[in-house]
Swiss-Prot record:
Function: Component of the ubiquinol-cytochrome c reductase complex (complex III or cytochrome b-c1 complex) that is part of the mitochondrial respiratory chain. The b-c1 complex mediates electron transfer from ubiquinol to cytochrome c. Contributes to the generation of a proton gradient across the mitochondrial membrane that is then used for ATP synthesis.
Cofactor entry: heme b
GO biological process entries: mitochondrial electron transport, ubiquinol to cytochrome c
Keyword Cell membrane among UniProt keywords: no
Keywords of the record: Electron transport, Heme, Iron, Membrane, Metal-binding, Mitochondrion, Mitochondrion inner membrane, Respiratory chain, Transmembrane, Transmembrane helix, Transport, Ubiquinone
TM spans (from-to): 33-53, 77-98, 113-133, 178-198, 226-246, 288-308, 320-340, 347-367
Other observations noted: Heme 1 (or BL or b562) is low-potential and absorbs at about 562 nm, and heme 2 (or BH or b566) is high-potential and absorbs at about 566 nm.
Membrane topology: Multi-pass membrane protein
Gene behind the chain: MT-CYB
Compartments in which it is found: Mitochondrion inner membrane
Protein name per its UniProtKB record: Cytochrome b
Binding-site positions, a ubiquinone: 201
Length: 379
């Protein structure tokens, strides 16, 4: 078997990626979230496949088909809630994974980092089109509001929106194409994830110390396979607790009402994992400015390798930037909270301050703190 896994054309790839892969001996539990994202993706594809067998992408029957899945299909309620809460677990792991990358300076591996940003955007797109499918009130109005933002693009905006809708409003054509997108995008994510891994294994993994670990590598199996299995067990435990005890805690009550184009909900808001970006969008009074800020809130991640001027790798020995980093995390939580609040004083003002702080920390404060720390080293 030892010879087979090293010589077989297919098993050789698996062997070099997951068994004999030389791995730094000191990577912590923060490095577990890559494998957890892989598990989340598998769970989402499998549960989604079973849901797609019973779902109908028609405006007249979509809401009823989701109710039918929950009531009449064997364990349909479980599959549906595993899928809905699995998306939340996916984004929790994704945010921690990106946060770890920023903290430990993983953006130095620029190819891996840039593919990661594409993965992040693709996952957000998948979650957005998926949220429209149950065809509840928040699904319908969320789709209307977010797709309508494209009308802010000069000259081609209105045409583009009608092209995406497949008509003059969000209707049957929109739901059908969103279902098609939601079905195909996870497989595109899987392909990008493989490319992400390919680039990572070209350079080798980063480690908490930020130092070169070539002299101290251990095989991935059994050390990190066991460690990953523990992480997977904990992830599944949290997911099952969510799905079985608190299935609707992260959802929106408005989505229990079928979509009605004639009745607008009091507060239109997306799922919790988009609230930070939604708060940034709402904090700018101009429509086009808001859309640009929304896009930049994610694309600014690509600036990290360019703005990094530090002579040290990661933040583990950099107290000044550490303080700024944790301020940034706190600011993200404030943005998430503001995104779920109504558009009125004082929430709008807090949102504007938090949005300015978000970009200021990344573009100005972090590079400045890097320079300060570089000068401290010289003393």
């Amino acid at each position: 078997m030892k010879i087979l896994r090293k010589n077989h054309p297919l098993l050789k790839i698996v062997n070099h990626s997951f068994i004999d892969l030389p791995t730094p001996s000191n990577i912590s539990s923060w490095w577990n979230f890559g494998s957890l994202l892989g598990v989340c993706l598998i769970i989402q594809i499998l549960t989604g496949l079973f849901l797609a067998m019973h779902y109908t992408s028609d405006t007249t029957t979509a809401f009823s088909s989701v109710a039918h899945i929950c009531r009449d299909v064997n364990y349909g309620w479980l599959i549906r809630y595993l899928h809905a809460n699995g998306a939340s677990m996916f984004f929790i792991c994704l945010f921690i994974h990106v946060g770890r990358g920023i903290y430990y300076g993983s953006y130095i591996l620029s190819e891996t980092w840039n593919i990661g940003i594409i993965l992040f955007l693709t996952t957000m797109a998948t979650a957005f089109v998926g949220y429209v499918l149950p065809w509840g009130q928040m699904s319908f109005w969320g789709a209307t509001v977010i797709t309508n933002l494209l009308s802010a693009i000069p000259y081609i905006g209105n045409t583009l929106v009608e092209w995406i809708w497949g008509g003059f409003s969000v209707d049957k054509a929109t739901l059908t194409r969103f279902f098609a997108f939601h079905f195909i995008l996870p497989f595109i994510i899987t392909a990008f994830a493989l490319v992400h891994l390919l680039f990572l294994h070209e350079t080798g993994s980063n480690n908490p110390s930020g130092l070169n670990s070539d002299s101290d590598k251990i095989p991935f199996h059994p050390y990190y396979t066991i460690k990953d299995l523990l992480g997977i067990f904990l992830l599944l435990m949290v997911l099952m607790i969510l799905a079985l005890f608190f299935p609707d805690v992260l959802g929106d009550p408005d989505n229990f009402t079928p979509a009605n184009p004639l009745n607008t909900p009091a507060h239109i808001k997306p799922e919790w994992y988009f609230l930070f970006a939604y708060a940034i969008l709402r904090s700018i009074p101009n429509k086009l400015g808001g859309v640009l800020a929304l896009i930049l809130s994610i694309l600014i991640l690509a600036a990290f390798p360019l703005l990094n001027t530090s002579k040290q790798h990661g933040l583990i020995f950099r107290p000044v930037t550490q303080t700024i980093y944790w301020t940034f995390i706190a600011n993200l939580l404030v943005l998430t909270w503001i995104g779920g609040q109504p558009v009125e004083y004082p929430f709008t003002t807090i949102g504007q301050i938090a949005s300015i702080t978000y970009f200021t920390i990344i573009i100005i404060l972090m590079p400045v703190s890097n320079t300060i720390e570089n000068n401290i080293i010289k003393l």
